[in-house]
């Protein structure tokens, strides 16, 4: 759920997706349970998933309600099901993930099913 970028521009796609460029992606994540500081510390160090240490993660708790915790998470890589695996490993099953940012591009006020074109300035920010 959340921000998806569609493009037919190969250079733009490469700049956004290739791990070498380390484009940050922001997510809101809801997990079951009250997340402890030790668990966040483990994520920030770079979680080990499938025998591979991943890059450090920026993460903070936004709020906790009824045994559910909402977090803000930033990754610079994005392997298959990485977020779910990270939280499963530290004991907090993921209930919802919503991407709100890819590099300089923000979801903003767009609602589900809505779209908009990138501005020339946004394209320039990605390519430079």
Annotate each language-model stretch with its function.
Residues 1-128:
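Basic, flexible Lys/Arg- and Gly-enriched helix-loop patches that mediate nucleic-acid binding at interfaces
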